[in-house]
Design a protein with these regions (language model features):
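A short, Lys/Arg-rich alpha-helix, primarily the initiator
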Residues: 1-15
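The alpha-helix within a helix-turn-helix
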Residues: 9, 20, 50
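Recognition helix of helix-turn-helix/homeodomain-like DNA-binding domains
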Residues: 25-39
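Residue-level detection of the helix-turn-helix DNA-binding "recognition helix"
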Residues: 10, 24, 35, 65
């Protein structure tokens, strides 16, 4: 699974801390996913991030198996 988190955050002018807080995950965890977009994460965390970004799973994460 790959992700577009960084691109979406930048295009919306958001802060990593804001998204992490709204997703209910640590800033460090979100930063890890941004810096290593091929890193996998749980479906639960992926959904939390998508909800915080107000974007569908298919737009934020690619190659979802």
């Amino acid at each position: 699974m790959s992700n577009n988190i960084k691109r979406i955050i930048e295009s919306k002018g958001l802060k990593i801390r804001f998204i992490a807080e709204n997703a209910g995950i640590s800033r460090q965890n979100l930063s890890r996913l941004i810096n290593y977009p091929e890193q996998s994460t749980s479906l639960e965390t992926a959904i939390k991030i998508c909800n915080a970004l107000n974007e569908p799973l298919e737009k934020v994460f690619t190659n979802v198996n």
